[in-house]
């Protein structure tokens, strides 16, 4: 039996086992990466060179429109520059290049350990707890993940988390998650989630390649020796962990949601398969103990907030406050972050202090989610209907709605291009414009109902206890 040692990281306590990675054991993973994807990216760039002049997303996320020659009527029309689809290029040209075919065969080969029924159950887990899942992914996995100072250095150099574009980038990431979860066919080879995962894999290769090229001519731009290769294997493992393990053992429990053993195994199986498509070492997610151990190892070893961590975390709050569809205030967003990450980590990330009022709103939200999710889980028919409706609503809000991606699905092309002068800066907080959002009002009502019900139960219990005690004393005397 291995000797267990209790450790703590940011108010999270756990037992250190042989499955956990020490910093020394994790070090090689900082310098290894997806070589095959980068080799294929070079070939795809030769076949279809990326558009020149694609700049970092600092204020505008849309391709520059162009005019075409034609009739007077046609000349009045403005046509956007088409996005380059690396997945389509790979699909079209893999038969004419051995290296491209190697990648194509790899991503289209189903590992022996994949059980499609289990994968589908894992997809349903995401929607069964959809509200807490999106809350956890935003405020614990993403915002709290900004505490990993080493990883943040790569994100900061893309410019994709300044306040003007962070919200859209978050929606694009959510689009990928939804494509991987809203249907079983979508995650199978040729499906929308499968294709997007391949695109993201090649995008990671492009970011890595760009940063390393800049660092060659200006070593101070990115410290490879200290931070490792950009978008390395350890970073990729951490990313999969934030979408899976962190939800299971951090975000969900802190919102009063506890998955069954079967749900945990199913959800991990889904993300292990996504990791495989992304070119991420998936052996760390083969069992529940391993998946939990790698999350805890990275939480313990990697989360040490820097000044850039504070900038990125606060930019997420600024970019999301008072925006549709929720119109939630900055204080409510901060309450969500503090509830899910704890005060110690939140203080280290430079998040503002909030009043008890917003703590009460967050408590109300957790109560609402817990009751709603558990009630649906109790009745299979309700659960199926809830999952079905959640798939439609999430897609409509994130992808179709004008305040989301406006029905323009991203192909994960290389738009956050690192440059020497690209570094994410802290945005400015402005005065609140919306009095109170519907979400905040709902949370307040829920908290008030539960608080009132608790007082009634407490009063009734006290009254009953007094009556019983009186009768007992009466018989004794």
Identify the meaning behind each predicted range.
Residues 1-477:
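Mature, function-bearing regions of proteins
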């Amino acid at each position: 039996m291995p000797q267990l040692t209790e450790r703590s990281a940011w108010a999270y306590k756990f037992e250190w086992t042989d499955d956990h990675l020490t910093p020394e054991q994790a070090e090689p993973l900082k310098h290894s990466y997806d070589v095959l994807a980068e080799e294929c990216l070079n070939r795809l760039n030769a076949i279809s060179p990326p558009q020149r002049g694609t700049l970092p997303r600092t204020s505008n996320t849309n391709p520059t429109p162009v005019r075409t020659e034609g009739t007077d009527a046609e000349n009045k029309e403005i046509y956007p520059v088409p996005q380059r689809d690396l997945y389509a290029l790979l699909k079209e040209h893999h038969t004419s290049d051995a290296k491209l075919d190697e990648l194509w065969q790899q991503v289209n080969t189903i590992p022996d350990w994949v059980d499609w029924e289990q994968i589908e159950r894992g997809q349903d887990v995401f929607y069964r707890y959809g509200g807490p899942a999106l809350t956890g992914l935003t405020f614990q996995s993403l915002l709290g993940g900004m505490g990993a100072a080493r990883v943040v250095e790569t994100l900061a150099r893309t410019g994709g988390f300044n306040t003007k574009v962070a919200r859209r980038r978050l929606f694009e990431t959510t689009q990928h998650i939804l494509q991987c979860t809203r249907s079983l066919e979508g995650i199978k080879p040729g499906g929308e989630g499968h294709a997007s995962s391949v695109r993201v894999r090649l995008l990671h290769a492009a970011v890595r390649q760009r940063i390393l090229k800049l660092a060659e001519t200006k070593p101070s731009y990115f410290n490879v020796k200290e931070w490792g290769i950009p978008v390395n294997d350890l970073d990729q493992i951490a990313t999969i962990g934030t979408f899976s393990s962190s939800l299971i053992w951090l975000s969900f429990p802190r919102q009063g949601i506890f998955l069954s053993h079967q749900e945990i195994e199913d959800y991990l199986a889904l993300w292990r398969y996504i990791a495989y498509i992304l070119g991420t070492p998936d052996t760390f997610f083969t069992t529940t103990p391993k998946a939990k151990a790698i999350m805890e190892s990275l939480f313990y070893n990697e989360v040490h907030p820097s000044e850039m961590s504070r900038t990125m975390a606060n930019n997420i709050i600024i970019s999301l406050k008072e925006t549709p569809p929720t119109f939630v205030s900055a204080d409510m967003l901060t309450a969500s972050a503090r509830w899910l990450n704890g005060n110690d980590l939140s203080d280290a990330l430079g998040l503002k202090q909030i009043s008890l009022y917003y703590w009460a709103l967050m408590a109300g939200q957790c109560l609402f989610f817990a009751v709603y999710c558990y009630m649906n889980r109790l009745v299979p028919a309700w659960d199926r209907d809830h999952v079905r409706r959640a798939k439609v609503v999430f897609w409509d809000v994130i992808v179709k709605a004008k305040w989301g991606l406006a029905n323009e699905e991203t192909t994960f092309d290389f738009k956050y291009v690192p440059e020497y002068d690209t570094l994410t800066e802290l945005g400015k907080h402005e005065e609140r414009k919306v009095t109170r959002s519907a979400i905040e009002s709902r949370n307040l009502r829920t908290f008030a109902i539960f608080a009132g019900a608790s007082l009634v139960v407490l009063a009734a219990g006290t009254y009953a206890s007094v009556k019983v005690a009186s009768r007992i004393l009466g018989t004794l005397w």
